[in-house]
Every structure is written in structure tokens, then in C-alpha cells.
Amino acid sequence: MLTNKEIRELLPHRYPFLLVDKVIELEPGKKVVAVKNVSANEPFFQGHFPEYPIMPGVLIVEALAQAAGIAVAVLEDNKGKLGVFAGIEAMKFKNQVMPGDVLTLEAEILVSKLGVTKAKVKASVDGKVAAEGEIKFAMTKA
């Protein structure tokens, strides 16, 4: 388990773009389960959409990428490195994420070679899948 403070030591993201609140399960280099508490005060809800607030899909994908990044950022070889997107594959959006939801972020590292990591990711609310797919990211010197 990682606290928000420990997450901020691993990721360079800060409010309003840090989208992982805590890590509840971590197998370094293999798997992570994290949580994003979706507040009605999120700045993106002002415009997406004021009368029917929905968390933008691209931000769900970003939250998944941040969670997956934590799974490899904790490895000694990646200390001080920055994870940057290299690809999004077969991402499907199945349910909406709204204010008050607790978004569970899961990432399983499939392969990591030549500095590029591929992960299977899933975001869910109360056991219902909101989004799932595969992402790729590269760990680079910051």
C-alpha cells in the first residue's frame, strides 16, 4: 500500500493532474491496484458537462497510466525516471464515471523491454467496468 505522499514521491504529477489517491495493492514490476476518489469539485466537471457531469474518458486512461506507471516506477532501475505514453490499444469505455464514485484502477504489466512497458488496464466502479484496454509507456530520464 502507498499513501498519497508516497505516490507524489514516485510521480511528477500534481493537482489537478495527479489522478491516483492511494495504492491498495502493489507487486513491483507486475501489478498495481489503486484508487481515485472522484469528487464533485474536480475542475473538469465545470465543462464536462455542467448539467450531467461525467469524468472524461481520456482522464480515466490517464489515471490508469499513472497507476501502471507506479508499478514500474518503484523498481530500482526506474528511480528518477518519467513514464510517458507510447500507445493506447483496444481501449473500451463501458460505463460512466460520475462525482462521488470511487474509481478502482488496475494494471497488470504484460511485458517490459527496451524501456517500453505494456500493461493491461481496467478501471471500475463498484465492480462495474468503466474502461479497459492496453497501454504502452516508456520510462525516460526526466
Curated annotation (Swiss-Prot):
EC number, UniProt record: 4.2.1.59
GO cellular component, as recorded: cytoplasm; membrane
Is the keyword Secreted assigned to this protein? no
Q: What is the active site of this protein?
A: 48
Q: Which reaction does it catalyse?
A: a (3R)-hydroxyacyl-[ACP] = a (2E)-enoyl-[ACP] + H2O
Keyword Chloroplast assigned to the entry: answer is no
Q: Name one GO molecular function term.
A: (3R)-hydroxyacyl-[acyl-carrier-protein] dehydratase activity
Residues in coiled coil: none
BP term (GO), one: fatty acid biosynthetic process
Location of this chain's protein in the cell? Cytoplasm
Q: Which UniProt keywords apply?
A: Cytoplasm, Lipid A biosynthesis, Lipid biosynthesis, Lipid metabolism, Lyase
Q: Name one Pfam family in it.
A: FabA
PANTHER family, sorted = 3-HYDROXYACYL-[ACYL-CARRIER-PROTEIN] DEHYDRATASE
Q: Which NCBIfam families match?
A: fabZ, PRK00006.1
Known function:
Involved in unsaturated fatty acids biosynthesis. Catalyzes the dehydration of short chain beta-hydroxyacyl-ACPs and long chain saturated and unsaturated beta-hydroxyacyl-ACPs.
Q: Which family does it belong to?
A: Belongs to the thioester dehydratase family. FabZ subfamily.
Name of protein: 3-hydroxyacyl-[acyl-carrier-protein] dehydratase FabZ
* Organism of origin: Ruminiclostridium cellulolyticum (strain ATCC 35319 / DSM 5812 / JCM 6584 / H10)
